[in-house]
Amino acid sequence: MLPLGVTMFGERVADVFHPGDHGTTFGGNPVCCAGAVNILSRIDDRLLEGVRERSDYLRRTLQAAPGIRSVTGMGLMLGLEIDIPAREFAERALREGVLVTTAKQKIRLLPALNIPMELLKTAAQALVHCAAE
């Protein structure tokens, strides 16, 4: 894994930052940038359709689960508002073999865009179990 941080701005705010005004620990590394260019060149309609399919499945499954109040986000980058403390949910998920992160009282899901559907289904069922436990 190569760390890379990116910040993008639209035209409305483009004149706010000038070279040297904003930096990031993971920004500008030539090796990481070369890796990012390679990955971006691999994004195609087939990959994006797979992301839509996986996202739809994950949303449907989690929205129907008792103990999960809401599912928000875009694509496979999702946030779960849950009935129990986020840390407790994260610990349950880890015991089930699913690594999640927390943000205040939300659970953050960030699976790989190309996660195999069977693995995603296994993880989703584990999360449903964690919410209902």
Stretch-by-stretch model annotation:
Residues M1-E133:
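Conserved N-terminal phosphate-binding loop of PLP-dependent enzymes in the Aspartate aminotransferase
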